[in-house]
A protein has these predicted regions:
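Catalytic-core signature of thiol
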Residues: 1-283
Length: 283
C-alpha cells in the first residue's frame, strides 16, 4: 500500500530552483494523516513517530508503509522525558536511531480499532480545544490527563500482523538537528521528507483558524504563552494573491481540528520559534 500521493500545492517547489518537486521527486508524496488524539501529553512522540512513519515510506520508495507505534515511544522511551506528562522530540529521534545510550528502533502500531499492526493505541480518544465535535467524544481538557501506559513487550493478542515482536523493529541510521534556516529546512523536507519541530503555543493559536484572516496563516498576535508544542512540518506554500509564505504543518489533535488536522504558520519570520527546534533522521 503506497503511503501517499502528491502534496497538491504544498511543498511543490525545489527551494533552490524554479522546477517543481512533482517532476523531480519520484514519486511525489503526501503526509500520513494526523491520528486521533487523547488526553496524554504525547505531542513530542506523535510528531517524531509520524515524521518517522513518513520518512520510512519515502525512503523505501513507497513500497512499504508501516504505521510506527506512538504508544511504544510514549511508554518505553524513559530517556525521552515523562511519557504522558511531556517529553522531548530530539530524544525520541535518538531512540529511533539508537543514539545517546538509547535502545534501537520501534515496532508498528495503529489506532484503537486497527488490528493490522503489532500494537494498538490504548488510550481513550477525546477532542482538543476547538475540534469539530461531531463524533460524541469528550473534551480532552474536561478531565485529568491520561497516565503513561505500560511499555509493551509483545504484539497484541488479537493482531493480524504477521511479524513477531522481536522482528518488528524499525531502525533509523541517524538523528540530527536541522539548522534554524528557512532554506535549509525546505531543502531537508524536499530531499528526505517531513521534519519534527517545536514551537511556543500562544492562546490565540488554540482556536485556529479563527483570527488568522483570509489566508489562514497563523502569526502570533500577543496572546498568553501556554508552553511548548511539537508538530510535523510537511511542506510549505504561498497564499494566493498576497504571496505570504507559510509552513504547512500537521498537528496532533486529529483530523477534526484546524484544516483537516493541519495548519499554516508564517514562514521565514521566526513565528513562535517554529524554525528554531527542528529535528529529523534518516532510515
Amino acid at each position: 500500500m503506497a503511503c501517499c500521493h502528491h502534496l497538491e500545492r504544498h511543498s511543490t517547489t525545489n527551494p533552490n530552483t524554479t522546477t517543481t518537486a512533482l517532476t523531480l521527486v519520484p514519486p511525489p508524496f503526501s503526509p500520513t494523516p494526523s491520528p486521533p488524539t487523547s488526553a496524554c501529553g504525547d505531542c513530542w512522540a506523535v510528531s517524531a513517530v509520524m515524521t518517522a512513519t513518513d520518512r520510512w515510506c519515502i525512503a523505501h520508495n513507497q513500497t512499504t508503509n508501516p504505521r510506527l507505534s506512538v504508544e511504544s515511544m510514549v511508554s518505553c522511551c524513559k530517556v525521552c522525558g515523562y511519557g504522558c506528562a511531556d517529553g522531548f522530540p530530539n530524544y525520541a529521534w535518538h531512540w529511533l536511531a539508537g543514539q545517546k545510550g538509547t535502545p534501537y528502533g520501534i515496532p508498528t502500531g495503529g489506532n484503537q480499532d486497527d488490528r493490522r499492526w503489532c500494537t494498538k493505541y490504548t488510550l481513550p480518544f477525546c477532542n482538543h480545544y476547538d475540534t469539530v465535535n461531531d463524533t460524541g467524544l469528550p473534551s480532552c481538557e474536561s478531565g485529568p490527563p491520561d497516565k503513561t501506559p505500560t511499555c509493551p513487550s509483545t504484539c497484541d493478542n488479537d493482531t493480524t500482523y504477521p511479524t513477531p515482536w522481536a522482528q518488528d523493529n524499525h531502525q533509523f541510521s541517524s538523528a540530527y538537528a536541522v539548522p534554524a534556516d528557512e532554506t535549509t529546512i525546505m531543502t531537508e523536507i524536499y530531499t528526505h521528507g517531513p521534519v519534527t519541530a517545536g514551537f511556543n503555543v500562544y492562546s490565540d493559536w488554540i482556536h485556529y483558524p479563527v483570527g488568522t484572516g483570509a489566508d489562514q496563516i497563523y502569526r502570533p498576535q500577543g496572546g498568553t504563552e501556554m508552553g511548548g508544542h511539537a508538530v510535523r512540518i510537511v511542506g510549505w506554500g504561498e497564499s494566493k494573491g498576497m504571496k505570504k509564505k507559510y509552513w504547512w504543518i500537521a498537528n496532533s489533535f486529529g483530523e477534526k481540528w484546524g484544516l483537516g488536522g493541519f495548519f499554516k504558520m508564517a514562514k521565514g519570520v521566526g513565528a513562535a520559534g517554529i524554525e528554531e527546534s527542528v529535528v529529523a533522521g534518516l532510515v
